[in-house]
Amino acid sequence: MDNLDPNSSLQVEKLRNRKSRAVWQNNNTTTHNNPYANLSTGEKSRSRHNTGSSYVSPYGGGNGEENAYTGNNNKSNTSGNLLQVPGAGGGGDLNSNKKQSRRMSIHVSARQHGRSFSQTGPIDMANLPALPKIGGVTTSGVGGAGGDVMTRTGGLTIEQKIFKELSQGSAAEVDDYYKTLLKQKNLITRDIKDNINQNQKNILQLTKDLKETQEELIELRGTTKELYEVLGYFKESAQRRLELEFEPETQKELHSPQKSNQLGIPSNKKKDRSSIMVLKKMWDSQLQSLFKHVDGASKFVQPLPNRHIVAESGRWFEVNVGNWKPSYPTHLFIFNDLILIAVKKSSSSSQEPTTGGSNGGSKSRLQAVQCWPLTQVSLQQIKSPKKDDDKMYFINLKSKSLSYVYSTDRYDHFVKVTEAFNKGRNEMIQSERLLDSRLSSPSNNNGDSKEEKRQLRESLRNSGNYKEGVTDDAGGAATGGGRKSAGTPNRNSTDYVLHDISARVHSRNRSQDLGNNFKLANNGKSQFFNEIKTLEDRLDDVDVEISHNQYAEAVELISIIESKLRNIENALTNQRNGGKNVNIADELLLLDVSKLKIKNRKENVSNGLIFDLQHNIAKLKQDDIDNILTLFDNLEQLDRGVQGYLDSMSAYLSTTVSKLIVGLQGSTKIDVVNYLSNLMVINVSIVKRTIQTYEQIIAPILKRHGDVDSSGLINWCIDEFTKLCKQIKKHLYGTLLISSGINMETDEPIYKVKERKLYDNFLKIMQPQLEELKSVGLNVDYIFESILNLE
């Protein structure tokens, strides 16, 4: 191009003075890069997608590069603003040159305006992902330290294909190849995402496995520690026993001549009691293992002191009495005071009793379903009506309203369960009898107050037969320097003391009657004495009525006896105040003793009435409650009767509500709303019933005594609904309510409604119930204000 003719120079000058220039000549730089050919130079490219190679400038860049369209090595000796047509120096078709110029104009314009397939930055060839196999294209991984990605099509890499094939190709071919690379990129991106997701899942699973392993190791560590402790206890116990057994002969000889040992009195040698500690430790371990392996056992069994498992058996099946076929694998746990029934959650256990058992089914967890105290259930062996069930053993568990039949194929398991049940039940019955005898013993009776003992001592002093040490404030009796009678174990009781006093007074009076019979008859002393004695004997009839739970007859007899004793006391008082020289000390003493006996009978009657209220309140009708409270009024203990009635209603309310709690575990939000609605309805109905009973029965009795105070009832209602409000908040929080902060004034959490629809449904149940309370004169809206006004 150095030897241009003058005509060519003139033509160049005309082109230079053109008013309209091509788009790519708006840039004043000397070099014009093809957007498809700048990858190898490291410059920024705005191509559609990095194709891995670069194009040589088709219109001469002044850098000695070969023209990609003409193959000529054109040197530019003119300004970069000249309009140079590709291939102008080498001839060629003018139309094709115009097409090439237009195509390059489009691409350069797209590059300048940042549109279409242009890019904004260089491509990092070292971090390109591996391309998947598509058609005949094969990919090679990252090799060596450089990690060049090789995509071969017929043995050519991407760069080689661009330089050798696409450099002479059209824009359509370049665009097609770009689309091919774009598909490869999408496939690679998808594979990368899939690999990332899979790796994340593997990491999560590994984390979960590690956590479970850690928990098992911690549990194993604790179990091992407990095992070493128990082994240590056993070792210490064995060492102590060996020391006691192999005691030196000299020590045995020192103990042998003692009279205490010859008389059978145990020596003061220190005993080994470590086995008790080991036993309690084993019992605690059993309960912990039960709570761990039996779901729901903690709801039925409380870890009380000395509660332990006596026997357990898993070779049982619950029997359908309709067809006498086994239905559910069952595990029986016999405690010293309870019997717990558990079933397997999984249904994959064996259904045949001959093949099923604790080891025959799947290793599924147990679910506790029933639990009764041993004294409230009976266990009996029954026989199946089928003749082919001779090898099976059946038992029937009966409670008040439920009955279950269980079967086993093992006689040893049958014997183990029945013997453990009978042993535990008999021990419980015996302990309850001992407890009842202690409670009913007058030495522990609430009626033995200090005032009664003081009156008894005064009566004894007045009679002249008082001895120091007969009674003390602790309720014991020690006569004559602290000696106790070993023949009568209940001699220290108040009843025995009262009976002894009565007997001595009777004996003394009879001896006086023999010597002064006529004199006593003249002053009327024998008449009063005999009347008091007759009335005192009628107290035995009161005891008979109390033992038969005939409290109305007992109260009637007590009222008659009290009335007659009151008349006798008035007559004796009139004689003493009349100035007559009459000795009535014996009559007054016997009268005081009779009063104390009557007071004890009243206490026994009131205890029986309280027992009926507490245990039969759900079955008692209005007339029965009226009779009980009337009896309390006749005994002059109306306050105790009213309080006992309110306490029994509280216990009945708690028992009724506790039956709903079992079904709440693991429930949904709708179940929580239903539970709280039932809770509200039950509380309102029972409180409403209590208020109506109070107004119909108790209020008229109080009115007869001139007392119209009902503050006790109001306080009871407020306490019950305060507990209900706390319970409702407890279940609403986390399900329908969320906490949004703390109230600085009341130091209570501020709640907000999370599930508005369910919360409104609950309010639709709650508000009518509160309106029902207003119909009986009770307004407790202020207690539930924090729930009703939530937003």
Swiss-Prot record:
Residue spans of biased composition, Polar residues class: 23-42, 438-447
Keyword Repeat on entry: no
Pfam families, A to Z: Exo84_C, PH_EXO84
Main location: cytoplasm
UniProt key word Coiled coil: yes
Cystine crosslinks: none
Record keywords: Coiled coil, Cytoplasmic vesicle, Exocytosis, Isopeptide bond, Protein transport, Transport, Ubl conjugation
Localisation: Cytoplasmic vesicle, Secretory vesicle
Protein name: Exocyst complex component EXO84
Family: Belongs to the EXO84 family.
Job of this protein: Involved in the secretory pathway as part of the exocyst complex which tethers secretory vesicles to the sites of exocytosis. Plays a role in both the assembly of the exocyst and the polarization of this complex to specific sites of the plasma membrane for exocytosis. Also involved in assembly of the spliceosome.
Glycyl lysine isopeptide (Lys-Gly) (interchain with G-Cter in ubiquitin), cross-linked positions: 193
Compositional bias (Basic and acidic residues): 247-256, 448-460
Coiled coil: 190-229, 521-577
GO cellular component, as recorded: exocyst; hyphal tip; transport vesicle
Biased composition (Low complexity): 70-83
Quaternary assembly: Component of the exocyst complex.
GO biological process: one example: Golgi to plasma membrane transport
Disordered, as annotated region: 16-101, 247-271, 432-495
